[in-house]
Amino acid sequence: MKASELKDKSVEELNTELLGLLREQFNMRMQASTGQLAQTHTLRTVRRDIARVKTVINQKAGQ
């Protein structure tokens, strides 16, 4: 996910995206704790996507 794609979305769409990413992160954490997560690098990418979405939301709030 690129920041340029996120800047085109509305705040409501960004909040929906953020909620989905947080759910995905929770599910991945549960899988990692039980040893079922094969690709552990996906946790890092989801965490960074969450940060990107939050950054764009804060930028839009400041405008």
UniProtKB/Swiss-Prot annotation:
GO cellular component: cytosolic large ribosomal subunit
This protein's UniProt keywords: Ribonucleoprotein, Ribosomal protein
InterPro entries: Ribosomal_protein_uL29, Ribosomal_uL29, Ribosomal_uL29_CS, Ribosomal_uL29_sf
Keyword S-adenosyl-L-methionine: no
Metal-binding found in the keyword field: no
Protein name: Large ribosomal subunit protein uL29
GO molecular function (one): structural constituent of ribosome
Pfam families referenced in this protein's UniProt entry, alphabetically: Ribosomal_L29
Superkingdom to which the source organism belongs: Bacteria
Family statement: Belongs to the universal ribosomal protein uL29 family.
Species, as recorded: Pseudoalteromonas translucida (strain TAC 125)
